[in-house]
Amino acid sequence: MSERYSGPLVVEGKLADAERMKQESNYLRGTITDDLNDGLTGGFNGDNFLLIRFHGMYQQDDRDIRAERAEQKLEPRHAMMLRCRLPGGVMTPQQWLAIDKFAGEKTLYGSIRITNRQTFQFHGILKGDLKSAHQLLHEVGLDALATANDVNRNVLCTSNPVESELHQQAYEWAKKISEHLLPRTRAYAEVWLDKEKVATTDEEPILGPTYLPRKFKTTVVIPPQNDVDLHANDLNFVAISDNGQLVGFNVLVGGGLSIAHGDKTTYPRTASELGYIPLAQTLAVAEAVVTTQRDWGNRTNRKNAKTKYTLERVGVDTFKQEVERRAGMTFETVRPYAFTGRGDRIGWVKGIDNKWHLTLFIENGRLLDYPGRPLKTGMAEIAKIHKGDFRLTANQNLIVAGVATRDKAKIEALARQYGLIDDSVTEQRQNSMACVSLPTCPLAMAEAERFLPEFVTQVEGIMHKHGVGDDHIVLRVTGCPNGCGRAMLAEIGLVGKAIGRYNLHIGGNREGTRIPRMYRENITEKEILTEIDQLVARWAGERHSGEGFGDFAIRVGIVKPVLDPAIDFYD
């Protein structure tokens, strides 16, 4: 074992308080039911504030009115964000109509938010409506179990509408992996679905009684598209096909983007290759990776608890050998694969099954009825007549999938009528993304979703001025260093530092395989735009044919590439 990877397999010391909370929760039940019946507050108290995350919810409040309510001696306007479990992002039009109705009638904001983890969120559910939200999901075959906190979260799958058979096979594995790694506790059914308590002892054979040390994210990726951003995830299965049929996976572990401002023991990390496996070993390997991280992950310091830090402590080879031992297999040599991009193909594409698929660009993933653009109503109208399925993408867009040729014109007419198709949207806007951030996210340090549209307009102006208006730069904005906007895999990434201020990172690539380096710290929007103007001017004038902005920034030495982030991210 090298000096670098000489850390202990298990970190000893005083456990983080979250470990106590999980241990005492009675398999995630806590006293959530008591809090649901407490009409004196709109929120959850004590441990329950964190426990509800295992049930797919975050307690939030409207930060725009927090100070005003404090002046009035009122508690914050508590409301919950609820995130659905939707492996691969696939859902039926009937499910869509059910969530559309709930969002319109029972949430403070009246919107459906598609996320870059290929699912949807309701924002602004009052405590008294939470049970009906979970019961509605259950009635249409969905749930919110394990979409947050220290479990395997929603499993992503490349939204590949063209290779229909390969996508179906990969999607089936995403569902199987999700189901296999789910918590076994009956707490969710008892609390939200009013299922009777069964006189049996709960067991968690995979996750264990205190679940995982930290959140855990999994993807199934179909090259050459890296739309799911595999390097942001703990466990990745890269699909290897032969004659259009899925035959196995390359397995990569230990990606992750979240950092903490000012804490140089935290850093983003791209995932490491373990090797190739045939399909039959998929669930055993998934389980072995999860249980190894369960047992070896750092439970004393949550900022150092993710799989990426476990790998840096013990070394990839040691981790790999343990996975092989637990799964009773040996990894084969990685099969060749390559990525060419991450963006969605907006508009119509035809699959090899002769069905048509319409990818709709949904800015920020926010479906709401805007003045003159009733997007949410438009999607409901499409759902009423669509005979295929809907696929939410990891770029926060929506695919109307499986459209027969005879139905194409009708679907497109509805999409245009309601503003869901806008031919003036640029490539730049299509390749820009932000997390939710203010006003609902309690962790937000700066604006992101509300900031992005006008900021992109400014960037479009710069691109046009320098003659590259038809090209794009992968642009991401995240409201805090937890990194939900995946700015740490962008060509230009903004990371919120304070209201109106961001760290500017540049030098990622279009394929999403390189982490960008911080170029300027704690600067304003005006300063950011000045920097981008100067950088785009150089890119436009000096780039090689077809050279992306991030690759250019590295080649000409504007920033040094991040090669080994545990060592050189802060250089």
Swiss-Prot record:
Cofactors demanded by this protein: siroheme; [4Fe-4S] cluster
Binding site for siroheme: C484
Catalytic activity: hydrogen sulfide + 3 NADP(+) + 3 H2O = sulfite + 3 NADPH + 4 H(+)
GO cellular component: sulfite reductase complex (NADPH)
Keyword Metal-binding listed: yes
Cofactor binding note: Binds 1 siroheme per subunit. Binds 1 [4Fe-4S] cluster per subunit.
Binding-site list for [4Fe-4S] cluster: C435, C441, C480, C484
GO molecular function, one term: 4 iron, 4 sulfur cluster binding
EC number from the UniProt entry: 1.8.1.2
Pathway where it operates: Sulfur metabolism; hydrogen sulfide biosynthesis; hydrogen sulfide from sulfite (NADPH route): step 1/1
UniProt KW keywords: 4Fe-4S, Amino-acid biosynthesis, Cysteine biosynthesis, Heme, Iron, Iron-sulfur, Metal-binding, NADP, Oxidoreductase
GO terms, biological process: cysteine biosynthetic process; hydrogen sulfide biosynthetic process; sulfate assimilation
Superkingdom assignment: Bacteria
EC class: oxidoreductase
HAMAP family: CysI
Family: Belongs to the nitrite and sulfite reductase 4Fe-4S domain family.
Function: Component of the sulfite reductase complex that catalyzes the 6-electron reduction of sulfite to sulfide. This is one of several activities required for the biosynthesis of L-cysteine from sulfate.
Subunit structure: Alpha(8)-beta(8). The alpha component is a flavoprotein, the beta component is a hemoprotein.
Name used for this protein in its record: Sulfite reductase [NADPH] hemoprotein beta-component
